[in-house]
Amino acid sequence: TIVNDGPAANGASGRSLSWLNSSRMRSAPYHRLRMAGVDRYRTLAARLPDVDWLRFDGGLTWDEDGPDNAIEDVYQYEVSIGYDARLLTPDAVAAVTPGIDAGAIAKQGAIFNPGEGWVDLPILIGVLLEEFAALGGELVKDQGAAKVLVENGRAIGAVTTSGKRFEADAVVLATGPAVPAMAAEAGQTIEDGTPVALLIQTKPLEHPLRAVLNTPRVALRPAPGGAISLDADWAADEGVTVREDGTYEIAPAVVDALLAEASSVMAGNPKLEVASIGAGGKPIPGDGEPVIGAMKAVPGCYAAFSHSGATIGLVAGELLSYEIATGREHPMLATFRPDRFSEE
């Protein structure tokens, strides 16, 4: 049983850039987990080769021009760990991947990672829920918010604000930015580094862009139907205000500025128009590393909380299911357990 406060994909999954990658630098265990995550998407893409919501057309990234430009160091690091990477001069990019304005790329060049891709999470979630239902699973979305039901020190299910109880042998907290507070209420500390994020999806347009772009001022990717999805940390920091009632106010000037940044890196600098805007918490644990596994302070309860939720989503569910079904800890999750915050 999945208990959700409203329709599926109404949280962080519905406003994610969902770039599938292990680009740049991170811990070795996190890199391995992300690569396993990308592998599962490749398997899915082979099973569904004609869909327009899961693509592996590569990723292109560059740094701002200046003394802090580290693109050469990043390239050397990626090569050293066997991560497929090509360092390109600005004028060489068009021959490798289309749709980018070479004039926007710093003179130090850009890295093209051909193995990267993107997924439209709401569509993926719909596909997975169809499989879930076919196997006898139930999605509950009309009972309000839920919390972990704890009796005699053990998680025995969930209870919603409507008073509905769902008893279970195991409970998984996979509620995005709400995980730390819900875990704390149940008795487990999980440090939280969640910022507010902003994602814009444009109206469809004809454009040759195929790769995911991660640039100094904007990240963007194609989306189904010819739209472009884009975000930037600075835009969320400057343009999103949390109201007293928990809703979000978005500054139109910042939206316009972000659209202009996106247009400036796209070939032909097309006019981009807003189709939808999403704002809300971007799930990031306090130390930046995923939190996946049993909450030892609350037997019977597990957590899945991570920044790279799209990239590792399929494999995280697989490995967590293994732990729940077998009672054995999976070695790939050894450094990601919730207990690490209680041990500090």
Predicted segments, located by residue:
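Mid-domain beta-loop-alpha active-site segment that forms a flexible
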Residues: A110-E130, G176-A178, I250-E261, F305-S306, ...
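Glycine-rich FAD pyrophosphate-binding loop
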Residues: T1-G14
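C-terminal catalytic lobe of FAD-dependent flavoproteins
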Residues: L121, S263-E344
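Dinucleotide-binding Rossmann-like beta1-alpha1 core, especially the glycine-rich loop
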Residues: S18-V96, R217-A219, G246, A253
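Central helical "cap/lid" subdomain
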Residues: S162-R210
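Active-site lid/adjacent beta-loop-alpha segment flanking the redox-cofactor pocket in flavoenzymes
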Residues: E206-V298
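Flavin (FAD/FMN) cofactor-binding and adjacent substrate-gating region
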Residues: D39, D63-L135, V140-K141, K147-R154, ...
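Conserved beta-strand-loop-beta-strand element in the redox core of flavoprotein oxidoreductases
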Residues: A146-F166, V171
